[in-house]
Amino acid sequence: MTALLKTENLSKTYPGFRLDNVSLRVEPGEIVGFIGRNGAGKSTTLKSLLGFVHPDSGETEFFGMPFRGNENAIKQQIGFVPGGVDYYPKSKIRTLVGVTSRFYKNWDEKVCDELLDRFGIPQSKTPSELSAGMKVKLALTLALSHGAKLLILDEPTSGLDPVSRDELLDILLDLRKDGIGILFSTHIISDLERAADRIVYIRNGNIAADRTVGEFESDYRLLFYTGRPEGIELIGERAERDGFTALVKSETGLGEKAGLEDIMLHLERSTK
């Protein structure tokens, strides 16, 4: 099966920061969580993938086609939802839909109308009248109305209340069933715990891990202690009210099952 997205050894250097040989892929019907703290390189990676900035090196393919030389054909099949979605605040939504539709050969007005109805977005309203969650749903509507096979989402749940975040994850899981691939950049770990098939963890511009959620959870356990245990590798030690916690490798048999949020927080604290 051809990957929807495959990038290898993507690099980009700025003063004080380097995106260093980033490689990742997204398969049809797969939600890939792209996680890292602010400034780790998530947005730089997405901008480099989509040609918003020019990488120094690396190769990127979408749908088996090199991005260079096929940008227009590829962008017809991609839906991009940037973080902090903003539109002309006083334009009617029907106007925004009309303008957006002109950029896509396969725009489906019926699909657009159905999605707007499903999400409860009246075309007579303006973006200034929509909540943050509704603005994200509008962005998804515009991304899906031209038959996108791949969605690239940059921090789509930031600033949303828990109910709106949960509704958005419901939508993404439904799209996954339809074979749409999703690259979901976020720093909200609980969202990925519910929805992601695989996690790509970026740290200081480098891919530190690329594993399924199950592999992360089977590799580590969470150990609570008051006195430092001898002869055990402690990963990402963190002070708690009554002692300390750290990750340990599962083969030690110590500790308890660790959730994805505990794993990622302790890995981020680790110096290794």
State what each model feature region is.
Residues 50:
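Helix-to-loop junction immediately C-terminal to a conserved catalytic motif
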Residues 151-155, 160:
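Catalytic Walker B motif of ABC-type/P-loop ATPase nucleotide-binding domains
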Residues 76, 82-138:
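ABC-family P-loop ATPase nucleotide-binding domains
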Residues 37-41:
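Walker A (P-loop) phosphate-binding loop of ABC-type ATPase nucleotide-binding domains
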